[in-house]
């Protein structure tokens, strides 16, 4: 029977049961829960101003305890998960038979693993083959599809051949991969310098030369368009034409310059400066005779000792004013005229620019474009510049003469004929060497 507080008492004990109920449970049996709830409400201070008052309709006591800043944190009981051991099945390396090497790939590709559909959770029967048990290796973590573990034996085996397995699970050329299974270690592509290119070429680079761009004078034979492709095995053997290159003695053809080629490049200001020796003619006295010019017609009209400015890089020789105005053509304009003068020593015609400069109500006559003549004859400061003029044709002959040092041999120019008795014979200049006396 229940008492006023809601506690039950046994019929045998009577008041003793009630006494035990009051002593054992007190306020927590029957109406004790109601009193305990109101006791907590009285002990908890009112919430602070501005703090959110959390009211939970189902568990008000828990919400009040959560608002109290001094309430201890009660850890929630957590059920401990059972320990599940992790198993990892490593692939078993399969040792390949010795007869299955590069040349045996065609036979391997014909052997198919048993097509198998999982049924009743029964593992597939063990079928021995040339690669032993590939399924153990395929059950490894490296070859398992997503969502399966190594412990799961329900694996769907495809129609697994050597060609399909290598094309679906790994690169075609396993030499350049960072990881490869140990079971296929013997099936690498052949090395770069191996000689098994007829069976499995592997990695190789072909070099082809379609055009014969080797010069004809080269010791190396030209490569025609029908040349074969050079594989890596041929390249590793070294140069093929080394011995032929050492034995060949190919010489370049001599370079020949023709005078007609040089004359086509010269202009009016820079005539041909190539010295051409003239076959000397001998007179009765045995002296060299220059018969290109008739010495009876030519006489000296100008003689100038060269200065530093005359032999400089400017290429200009200042003419003596008296001789220039007396024997050279008269100038009416400052720009001047072009004078053609034959070289006395060489078969060359020089084109000089003859002009004047105004100088204090006077004129200074110059002969320009003389740099080539000075260099050709090797003239220096102190050497002599001589001009001859024909009395009949009016042509000019120019001559450069080296300065005569004391006690040195100097050339003497005379007019001589082949036959002194017959004055109608051709005459020319003769050059004789004499010693200058001091």
Swiss-Prot record:
<feature type="region of interest" description="Disordered">
    <location>
        <begin position="225"/>
        <end position="285"/>
    </location>
</feature>
<feature type="compositionally biased region" description="Low complexity">
    <location>
        <begin position="1"/>
        <end position="11"/>
    </location>
</feature>
<feature type="compositionally biased region" description="Gly residues">
    <location>
        <begin position="12"/>
        <end position="30"/>
    </location>
</feature>
<dbReference type="InterPro" id="IPR044800">
    <property type="entry name" value="LEC2-like"/>
</dbReference>
<dbReference type="GO" id="GO:0003677">
    <property type="term" value="F:DNA binding"/>
</dbReference>
<dbReference type="Pfam" id="PF02362">
    <property type="entry name" value="B3"/>
</dbReference>
<keyword id="KW-0539">Nucleus</keyword>
<keyword id="KW-0238">DNA-binding</keyword>
<dbReference type="InterPro" id="IPR003340">
    <property type="entry name" value="B3_DNA-bd"/>
</dbReference>
<dbReference type="GO" id="GO:0005634">
    <property type="term" value="C:nucleus"/>
</dbReference>
<feature type="DNA-binding region" description="TF-B3">
    <location>
        <begin position="302"/>
        <end position="404"/>
    </location>
</feature>
<feature type="compositionally biased region" description="Basic and acidic residues">
    <location>
        <begin position="258"/>
        <end position="269"/>
    </location>
</feature>
<protein>
    <recommendedName>
        <fullName>Putative B3 domain-containing protein Os04g0676650</fullName>
    </recommendedName>
</protein>
<feature type="region of interest" description="Disordered">
    <location>
        <begin position="1"/>
        <end position="30"/>
    </location>
</feature>
<feature type="compositionally biased region" description="Polar residues">
    <location>
        <begin position="272"/>
        <end position="285"/>
    </location>
</feature>
<dbReference type="InterPro" id="IPR015300">
    <property type="entry name" value="DNA-bd_pseudobarrel_sf"/>
</dbReference>
<keyword id="KW-0805">Transcription regulation</keyword>
<dbReference type="GO" id="GO:0003700">
    <property type="term" value="F:DNA-binding transcription factor activity"/>
</dbReference>
<keyword id="KW-0804">Transcription</keyword>
């Amino acid at each position: 029977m229940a008492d006023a507080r809601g506690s039950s008492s046994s019929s045998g004990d009577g008041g003793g049961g009630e006494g035990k109920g009051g002593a054992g449970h007190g306020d927590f049996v029957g109406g004790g829960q109601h009193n305990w709830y109101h006791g907590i409400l009285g002990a908890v201070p009112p919430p602070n101003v501005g703090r959110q008052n959390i009211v939970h309709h189902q568990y008000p006591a828990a919400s009040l305890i959560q608002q109290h800043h001094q309430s201890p944190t009660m850890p929630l009981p957590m059920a401990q998960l059972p320990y599940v051991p992790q198993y990892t099945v490593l692939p078993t390396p399969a040792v390949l038979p010795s007869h299955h090497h590069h040349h045996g790939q065609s036979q391997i590709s014909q052997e198919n693993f048993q097509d198998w559909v999982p049924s009743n959770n029964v593992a597939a029967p063990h079928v021995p083959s040339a690669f032993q048990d590939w399924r153990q290796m395929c059950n490894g973590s490296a070859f398992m599809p997503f969502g399966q573990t190594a412990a799961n034996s329900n694996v769907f085996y495809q129609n697994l051949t050597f060609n399909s397995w290598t094309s679906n699970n790994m690169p075609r050329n396993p030499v350049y991969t960072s990881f490869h299974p140990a079971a296929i270690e013997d099936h690498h592509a052949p090395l770069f310098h191996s000689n098994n290119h007829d069976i499995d070429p592997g990695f190789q680079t072909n070099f082809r030369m379609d055009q014969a761009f080797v010069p004809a004078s080269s010791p190396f034979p030209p490569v025609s368009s029908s040349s074969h492709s050079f594989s890596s095995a041929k390249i590793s053997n070294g140069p093929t034409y080394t011995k032929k290159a050492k034995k060949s003695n190919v010489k370049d053809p001599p370079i020949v310059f023709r005078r007609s080629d040089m004359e086509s490049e010269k202009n009016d200001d820079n005539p041909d400066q190539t010295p051409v020796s003239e076959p000397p003619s001998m007179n009765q006295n045995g002296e060299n005779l220059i018969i290109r010019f008739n010495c009876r017609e030519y006489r000296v009209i100008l003689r100038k000792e060269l200065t530093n400015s005359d032999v400089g890089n400017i290429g200009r020789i200042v003419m003596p004013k008296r001789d220039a105005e007396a024997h050279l053509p008269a100038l009416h304009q400052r720009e001047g005229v072009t004078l053609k003068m034959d070289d006395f020593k060489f078969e060359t015609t020089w084109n000089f620019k003859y002009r004047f400069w105004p100088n204090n109500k006077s004129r200074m006559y110059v002969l320009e474009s003389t740099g080539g003549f000075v260099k050709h004859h090797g003239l220096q400061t102190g050497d002599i510049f001589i001009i001859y003029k024909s009395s009949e044709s009016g042509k000019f002959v120019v001559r450069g003469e080296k300065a005569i040092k004391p006690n040195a041999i100097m050339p003497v120019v005379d007019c001589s004929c082949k036959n002194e008795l017959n004055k109608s014979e051709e005459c020319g200049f003769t050059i004789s060497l004499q010693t200058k006396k001091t």
